[in-house]
Amino acid sequence: MNPNQKIITIGSVSLTIATVCFLMQIAILVTTVTLHFKQYECDSPANNQVMPCEPIIIERNITEIVYLTNTTIEKEICPKLVEYRNWSKPQCKITGFAPFSKDNSIRLSAGGDIWVTREPYVSCDPGKCYQFALGQGTTLDNKHSNDTIHDRIPHRTLLMNELGVPFHLGTRQVCIAWSSSSCHDGKAWLHVCVTGDDKNATASFIYDGRLVDSIGSWSQNILRTQESECVCINGTCTVVMTDGSASGRADTRILFIEEGKIVHISPLSGSAQHVEECSCYPRYPGVRCICRDNWKGSNRPVVDINVKDYSIDSRYVCSGLVGDTPRNNDRSSNSNCRNPNNDKGNHGVKGWAFDDGNDVWMGRTISKDSRSGYETFKVIGGWSTPNSKSQINRQVIVDSDNRSGYSGIFSVEGKSCINRCFYVELIRGREQETRVWWTSNSIVVFCGTSGTYGTGSWPDGADINLMPI
């Protein structure tokens, strides 16, 4: 190859390389500009229109790094649209309940710093479940735990942990409260926290970590609420609150709350005579609650809440196998669906039930006289037929030789249906166990299952002789 040919060849190769590089730079430039503009757009699932991402959301976005030769481009991915929960799916069909969680708080207190608590409950946001309880402002192995049998002191706070995590020293204290309820509307948590003087208490409404509203006592006699989860449908949360006598006529009101703000208050109506400590669940398009009549009945009151027009109705669970404690034996107990049965109505315990067509699932203490043992079963016709007593699918949760306590319901939304779950408070210490000076609890949690299941007993399990005094 002569010198001229060499020059021509080298020139051709150089020109080709330059052209390729030029085209690559154009491609990089086009890609950069395209990604720059697309990072501020997201597709709305509602109408397929392009919506601008709000700048305030960018801090929560996921950042993807895209590498093009030596150029680094950050692409912002628009987050999913956060929506209110509507609970419109059907209730899951179940055959019974399967074990889900147990926190073993009392056993762990023998060798660790665990809060003294009572009135526990469970509630879930769209992605995770949490356990709550009212702390006594002290750990168990602490002299402040003496005489913690008392319900209402200014040091009590609402505690919140992931389900299954005992209330250790690092636990978050959500608010000041000796009575409470919590629920998640799909966007943020609402906490209803009651504290203050018995004759002039205050309920604070905390939404998304901020105090939004409050209400004072309306009957000057221990304003109190559910001690389990409230329910939110399409952004409206309902909570049942009572103020007045615990063994006589009281003033029960249902509060409707939107993002922490009270938007309406409805008085209790219907045939229920006394209502407190309600266990509520979504029954689209409304909310249904099973409560405690501490005055006249050992059959449990039912409160139906219409979220759209704020109307209220109430009656009693029809099952002749009644759910409260104390109660008459099953042969002589009764319920006519409309009125309290006037059988050992004075005193009681928080509990739960839920309808399943014409039937009812329910839980109760095994003992008819004390908070000992715990059982669940289904009563055929127990939702619609007065004094129905045909029991099936009975399960022992805590054997009759061990203590139980309050119990309540919470709901979990699955892919195709809404499951019902419950917790049982396992009380230990005073008054029954006088070797120690404290009163506290652990919990056990079960959820509905469509599968098969075995048998067992899941008591607290702590040896009181090994516990701090």
UniProtKB/Swiss-Prot annotation:
GO molecular function terms listed in the Swiss-Prot or TrEMBL record: exo-alpha-sialidase activity; metal ion binding
Catalytic activity as recorded in UniProt: Hydrolysis of alpha-(2->3)-, alpha-(2->6)-, alpha-(2->8)- glycosidic linkages of terminal sialic acid residues in oligosaccharides, glycoproteins, glycolipids, colominic acid and synthetic substrates
Positions contributing to substrate binding: 118, 152, 276-277, 292, 371
Transmembrane segments: 10-30
Compartment(s): Virion membrane; Host apical cell membrane
Family matches, as InterPro entries: Glyco_hydro_34, Sialidase_Influenza_A/B, Sialidase_sf
Topology of the protein relative to the lipid bilayer: Single-pass type II membrane protein
Hypervariable stalk region: annotated span: 36-88
Record note on modification: N-glycosylated.
UniProt-annotated stretches for the region Involved in apical transport and lipid raft association: 11-33
GO cellular component terms listed in the entry, alphabetical order: host cell plasma membrane; membrane; virion membrane
Pfam families the record matches: Neur
Keywords: Calcium, Disulfide bond, Glycoprotein, Glycosidase, Host cell membrane, Host membrane, Hydrolase, Membrane, Metal-binding, Signal-anchor, Transmembrane, Transmembrane helix, Virion
Residues annotated as glycosylated: 61, 70, 86, 146, 200, 234, 402
Cofactor: Ca(2+)
Functional description taken from the UniProt entry: Catalyzes the removal of terminal sialic acid residues from viral and cellular glycoconjugates. Cleaves off the terminal sialic acids on the glycosylated HA during virus budding to facilitate virus release. Additionally helps virus spread through the circulation by further removing sialic acids from the cell surface. These cleavages prevent self-aggregation and ensure the efficient spread of the progeny virus from cell to cell. Otherwise, infection would be limited to one round of replication.
Subunit and interaction comment: Homotetramer.
Additional note from the record: The influenza A genome consist of 8 RNA segments. Genetic variation of hemagglutinin and/or neuraminidase genes results in the emergence of new influenza strains. The mechanism of variation can be the result of point mutations or the result of genetic reassortment between segments of two different strains.
Protein name, per record: Neuraminidase
Source organism (scientific name): Influenza A virus (strain A/Memphis/1/1971 H3N2)
Gene from which the chain derives: NA
